[in-house]
Amino acid sequence: MIFLYWHSPNRAIFERSFFVEDASAETVIRAVSRWCVLDECGRIVPAAKVPHKETVLSEERAFTDQDWKIGEEIPLWEKPIYSMTVACSEYDLNMHMNNIKYADCVFNCFSVKELSARVLSGFSLHFLRQSHEGDRLDFYRHALSDSVYQVVGKCGEVPVVSARVEFCRAQTE
């Protein structure tokens, strides 16, 4: 079952939380969507000036900052593990790199052998900035423990995406 909960907008940011529950009402997927509205000059339109339907807000089910924030800093000694240049095939209708393409890049930071040997137990992705055609993105992977990794994608020195990848155990045959 899929549940959608709206958050109360602050002055500029709109948010929705999504939950997918299995048959035993256990949450198996959680996601949050955050966005703002820009005018034709690229300025943020205050939330109070954006027409929208009245919705039932469910703050008790909404994500907290701790649920979605992932660090953006990677130790200075880390070298890029994967790099790519954004091309037209990564674009979406909004004329920037499609969000799901970032997930592909994060998993390109692991070898097939590494992924085959483990079971994925958690994946969090935080989009920080848009990427456009011609941008060179460098992805850095840092082990936080034996089973938890942080991946940060940067355009130059600017982080554009941050991810947390968690494994629960070794894959059994």
List each model region and its residues.
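HotDog/MaoC-like acyl-thioester-processing domains
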Residues: 6-76, 127, 131-133, 142-173
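Acidic/His-leaning functional-site neighborhoods
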Residues: 78-166, 172
